[in-house]
């Protein structure tokens, strides 16, 4: 059961980080001053 919980937490953290990364990249897309991140 512990392995399942660790797996679920890993998937949740993965999707949350994907969402945050997509939000930040779309934010830099609208902000022309932050082109150096690419």
From Swiss-Prot:
InterPro entries: PSII_PsbI, PSII_PsbI_sf. It is a single-pass membrane protein. One of its GO terms (biological process) is photosynthesis. It holds the Pfam family PsbI. The chain crosses the membrane at residues 6-26. GO terms for cellular component: chloroplast thylakoid membrane; photosystem II reaction center. Keywords: Chloroplast, Membrane, Photosynthesis, Photosystem II, Plastid, Reaction center, Thylakoid, Transmembrane, Transmembrane helix. It comes from the Eukaryota. It is found in: Plastid, Chloroplast thylakoid membrane. Belongs to the PsbI family. One of the components of the core complex of photosystem II (PSII), required for its stability and/or assembly. PSII is a light-driven water:plastoquinone oxidoreductase that uses light energy to abstract electrons from H(2)O, generating O(2) and a proton gradient subsequently used for ATP formation. It consists of a core antenna complex that captures photons, and an electron transfer chain that converts photonic excitation into a charge separation. PSII is composed of 1 copy each of membrane proteins PsbA, PsbB, PsbC, PsbD, PsbE, PsbF, PsbH, PsbI, PsbJ, PsbK, PsbL, PsbM, PsbT, PsbX, PsbY, PsbZ, Psb30/Ycf12, at least 3 peripheral proteins of the oxygen-evolving complex and a large number of cofactors. It forms dimeric complexes. NCBIfam families: PRK02655.1 (NF002735). HAMAP family: PSII_PsbI (MF_01316). This is Photosystem II reaction center protein I. The lineage of its organism: Eukaryota, Viridiplantae, Streptophyta, Mesostigmatophyceae, Mesostigmatales.
């Amino acid at each position: 059961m512990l392995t399942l919980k660790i797996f679920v937490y890993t998937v949740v953290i993965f999707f949350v980080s994907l969402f945050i990364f997509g939000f930040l990249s779309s934010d830099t897309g609208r902000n022309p001053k932050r082109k150096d991140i690419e």
